[in-house]
Design a protein with these regions (language model features):
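C-terminal ends and interior cores of transmembrane alpha-helices
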Residues: 79-98, 375-385, 432-462
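Helix-loop boundary and gating motifs at the non-cytosolic
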Residues: 3-53, 309-319, 378-388
Length: 563
């Protein structure tokens, strides 16, 4: 899996891990911040969230076009600097009016910086495999690169949660997902008697505040201010992670400097060095059209996947906050301690290394690491309290954990199928991924039956008498991850492989532009989050995923011609 890969892959993957850690720390709490700080309802928060995600994934198209002219490395470095300024702006607490426009400016800068950084870094990874010595390892490389992204993402919700708990605890408050919305109702004078009594009861019991004796309106203001400030400082974590990414990038630059230029520069450099290993592909106009058409068809399909997948920061977070039990017990506690998850990931990789090792020394080392990982996970687990409270953003650590943990199994499966000549093509994997994404929302739909609508629950927080088990969302994320592993790294690899050489940056940007459209469409379910039953909301996503799968299978012959 890791053998015979160019060293530049690991350097670029680590640089991306740092940047993604900061980004996913922000995403884990962004919609919660919008509702806590500004009192936005789900529809308003959905509009801002989806527009931001659209910018994040659309601007790589512009970044790719610029990189095709000026070079990939220059755009990556510029992107890091621009993102840093954006996250810094978002991390500074301010009053409501200033905070709103400061946030808009920050989101614009983060989107622009990501547009320059994200796609071009992935093009550089793909360019490493234009060398004939590594060309056969392209799919594996993108799976490893994708895994590295998710290592950063796995720790992000824990970082955000730690900051929230620390800041609120310092101010004498305890987080409760029901309170921000009700606090704004109290401030506006629209809170129902049931919600007012609920908050007063929680204050009197000490469940959400320590020794608070003031009136409810003052409490609401102070609670919102404390929570909002904790989110600001959570965004500041992204600044630190970008500094780490920059250090890794510049310190390891010698390992990938040969792929920093645009495609024309790279070919000229290879010719000057008489490097016969670099693949210089010349396409006829007809072949170019066929490839671009195939890519556009794939782009159409992935729109619907990302619309379904990126509910994680929106409706799935709402579901975690409003409909899911906020206390965990038993074995489920393991999933909400990121260090236990990390030890399990290490255990999986060490076991793979053990069975793949060719020497007794390597087997011994892998075996020792596996044993220590098991001991580490066990020692943490047995020290956990019998039950503890979880925050909604913590559910977002499951998807990246599953990606990291399942990637070796995915690579092993497709490697075995490849050796027997039965490995599905990238387009076929994408189609299967759409079917599995539909299955994930079928699971969530069944678990949501009989629950009150979001609008009814907002009016009376006591209506939900039997919240969903955390395992329902964990299972949903697991099935979505199976879909993601079939679609995302394979799609990126497909673009890298099929894109005409002179259009690589633009085509990778096209992939992200399609993702942007899907992310903008995320708000559809967010805006429907109100009077519609939950099963109807999930049913919309099921239907769209199934339609996309049918479309993909209908175009399969055309797509497989260019593979």
């Amino acid at each position: 899996m890791f053998e015979n890969q160019p060293k530049g892959l690991f350097a670029l993957a680590l640089a991306n891990t740092g940047e993604r850690f900061g980004y996913y720390t922000m995403i884990a709490i962004f919609t919660l911040f919008l509702q806590a700080k500004f009192g936005f309802d789900e529809g308003q928060a959905s509009g801002i969230y989806s527009a931001f995600l659209a910018g994040i994934y659309f601007l790589p198209l512009i970044g790719g076009i610029l990189a095709d002219k000026f070079g990939y490395g220059k755009m990556v470095v510029t992107g890091l600097a621009v993102m840093f300024i954006g996250y810094l702006l978002l991390a500074i607490p301010a009053n409501d009016n200033v905070a709103y426009w400061s946030m808009i400016g920050a989101l614009a800068l983060i989107s622009l910086g990501t547009g320059l950084f994200k796609g071009n870094l992935q093009v550089m990874v793909g360019n490493l495999y234009d060398d004939k010595r590594y060309a056969s390892k392209r799919d594996t490389a993108f799976s490893l690169f994708y895994m590295a992204i998710n290592i950063g993402a796995m720790f992000a919700p824990t970082a955000a949660t730690a900051m929230t708990n620390w800041m609120m605890g310092r101010d004498g408050f305890v987080y409760d997902g029901r309170i921000p919305s009700i606090a704004h109702q109290i401030i506006d004078g629209t809170a129902s008697q049931a919600n007012t009594d609920l908050v007063q009861g929680l204050i009197n019991s000490g469940a959400i505040a320590t020794n608070y004796t003031g009136d409810l309106v003052t409490f609401a203001h102070q609670y919102i201010e404390s929570l909002s400030r904790s989110y600001n400082y959570g965004f500041g974590i992204a600044c630190l992670s970008l500094i780490l990414s920059a250090v890794i990038y510049f310190s390891c630059r010698r390992l990938f400097k040969h792929v920093e230029g645009n495609s024309k520069q790279m070919v000229e450099d290879a010719k000057a060095a008489n490097n016969a290993n670099v693949i210089e592909e010349e396409l006829t106009p007809q072949e170019t059209r066929q490839r671009v058409t195939a890519l556009i068809l794939v782009f159409i399909v992935v729109i619907f996947f990302w619309m379904a997948f990126h509910q994680n920061g929106l409706t799935l977070t709402y579901f975690a906050r409003d409909y899911t039990a906020s206390t965990v017990t038993g074995a489920t506690r393991m999933g909400f301690n990121v260090w236990i998850l990390a030890f399990f990931a290490i255990l999986i990789y060490s076991l793979f290394s053990f069975f793949q090792a060719k020497t007794s020394k390597s087997k011994t080392i892998a075996g020792v690491v596996a044993a220590l990982s098991l001991v580490g996970a066990g020692s943490i687990y047995f020290e956990l309290p019998n039950s503890f409270t979880i925050l909604p953003q913590q559910f977002q650590q499951f998807n990246p954990f599953f990606v990291v943990a399942l990637t070796p199994f995915s690579l092993l499966l497709f490697s075995a199928l490849g050796r027997s000549g039965k490995e599905p093509t990238a387009p076929r994997k994408i189609a299967y991924g759409m079917l599995i994404a539909a299955l994930a929302y079928c699971l969530l739909s069944v678990g949501s039956m009989g629950m009150p609508t979001p609008a009814a629950l907002s009016a009376d927080a006591n209506l939900l008498t039997n919240p969903a088990s955390p395992n329902l969302l964990i299972g949903t994320y697991l099935v979505l991850t199976f879909a993601e592993l079939l679609l995302s790294p394979m799609g990126i690899s497909f673009v890298s492989k099929v894109a005409p050489p002179k259009l690589k940056g633009a085509m990778m940007g096209g992939w992200f532009a399609a993702t942007a459209i899907g992310n903008y469409a995320v708000q559809i379910t967010g805006r429907l989050w109100g009077d519609l039953p939950l099963t109807a909301i999930w049913g919309i996503l099921i239907g769209l995923c199934l339609l996309a799968a049918v479309f993909m299978f209908s175009m399969m012959k055309r797509l497989e011609k260019v593979c």
